Amino acid sequence: INRRIAVTPASILLEPLPKTQAVAVAAARMLDRAAAAGEIDFIGGFGAHVQKGLTSSDENLMRSLPAALSRTQRVCSYFNMGSTRAGLNMTAVERFGHVLKELAFRSRTGIGCAKVAVFANVPEDNPFMAGAHHGAGEPDFAVNVGISGPGVVKAVVEQNPNCDLTELSEVIKRTVFKITRAGELIGKEVAHLLGVEFGIVDISLAATPRAGDSVAEIIEAMGVSRMGRPGTTAALALLIDAVKKGGAMASGHVGGLSGTFIPVSEDAGMIRAVRQGALSLEKLEALTSVCSVGMDMFAVPGSTPPDVLSAIIADELSIGIINNKTTSVRVIPVPGKRAGQIVHFGGLFGSAPIMPVSRKASKDFVIRRGRMPAPLQSLRN
């Protein structure tokens, strides 16, 4: 169990203060010390909502990010750069490619980039790092619970090798119902003991590097020969649908991301699929059209140009914007590493094979900047 806490977006807290890097870094270090004193593993919220533009505080926070995250251990950051209602802030996306490169080269493994995620349609009550923050519509305090539990789901899938897909969906739904009920019960009791409000249950299946705690292995237990091969997207869609239906029946307060995470470095099955050539960067992006969190915890060569990183972010966030869903990117350019090598982060972050990526991206498109208009489906009133 990891203890996590999230604060109001730091750009709001820093708005009345001097717009200097020293102030932003000092704020990050203060959060880091507070988390250490409270024995909190990660503290989120060092971020901003910039989907329509950047305030002076937002710009200062973004400039300060490499220094802030390289000088702290527990602080996590997020930036919401797009939404179905607002479109995509391509100016922020273009700048962020350079921020990621600088952040990566401040550590030997690029681990700082594992503590920052770029979002479209970010939820305000997400309990999972690195995107967790305490949204403007939240009460003073709230307890939000993430259920995780891929190992339990994998076990029940393996126990039902001969049922058809309708029956398989029912089995998964019943299992997630039980997990969600337990999570809500624990969350409400913790909230009661703390004297604060209970928020939501995030019913996401979230992998860890531990053996048997893999979302990819659920997909393989369903009959796909290896994660990433033909059939993977359909199996993942079935899994996510069953998870949502089971969780929604179990709790009246389902929120956060609530789907299925497919981080590369934190999932043993995903790592194996990449190393065996079954899962490419392009297939990972395709899977995010049905999964909840986007392209998560994947490593690319340290020589990857900033405009390529920005283009990857723009592609992924566009999927979320057009489909009115949350998507995100956590990409780690690893200094000195080439495609096919592996980097070890340790702990919850696991290890990641370096995935090949085209160095000839779309620089002329990325440097146009500006704001990509919101899609037609944003007009829903």
Predicted regions and their residues:
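Anaerobic metallocofactor- and corrinoid-dependent redox/one-carbon enzyme cores
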Residues: 1-381
